[in-house]
A protein has these predicted regions:
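Accessory nucleic-acid engagement/destabilization modules that flank
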Residues: 1-179
Length: 179
């Protein structure tokens, strides 16, 4: 039995929303959970998962990007609020990225935001209800200084990473799942 992608996205959204509600940001958690794996709708990712899961015979594939599409979608959908969304989603398996390009550092966010074709290839495959805009309020409703913003992004990131892991555990091993 496999967990469908929508089941995982909604399950992760439910948990991330619950975690982020503890600091009055449930809607941010919900959006992060719903969008964090949208890139898995790509043909490349579906091929990758089939080969790496043993579902299809053949050699194993290398890694494939499944986070850039949602980071780009965040910039399109939330022009003034996109950075926290993009940072959290782009880094949910690897850690938070740097923004500016540094040739000594791989995986920075600015490079991911240039991959418009990733989003273009999957946009029509994403169920419309996952693309519905959620009303997001700025953190704590007022401007915050960079240190506060940094902490807030890390809190959201933690909500997403924990929710992603726990939703997978809930599906794979329900008897051991607990919050």
């Amino acid at each position: 039995e496999t967990q469908s992608l929508p089941e995982h996205l909604y399950g992760t959204a439910e948990l991330a929303s619950q975690f982020a509600a503890t600091f009055h940001n449930a809607e941010w958690g919900k959006l992060l959970g719903m969008w964090h794996d949208l890139g898995k709708y790509s043909d490349e990712f579906q091929e990758y998962i089939k080969k790496n899961s043993g579902y299809e015979e053949g050699e194993r594939l290398g890694k494939t990007d499944h986070t850039s599409a949602a980071a780009i979608l965040a910039k399109e959908t939330y022009p003034s609020l996109w950075p926290p969304i993009a940072y959290c989603i782009a880094g949910h398996h690897t850690g938070l990225h740097n923004f500016t390009h540094d040739s000594r550092v791989s995986g920075d966010l600015s490079d991911r935001l240039k991959k418009q074709d990733y989003l273009d290839k999957i946009r029509s495959k994403i169920p419309n209800e996952l693309l519905e805009k959620i009303n997001l309020n700025p953190p704590i409703g007022k401007p915050i200084d960079p240190k506060q913003m940094h902490l807030w992004i890390r809190m959201l990131f933690s909500c997403l990473v924990d929710a992603d892991y726990l939703d997978t555990e809930r599906f794979m091993n329900p008897e051991s799942f607990e919050l």
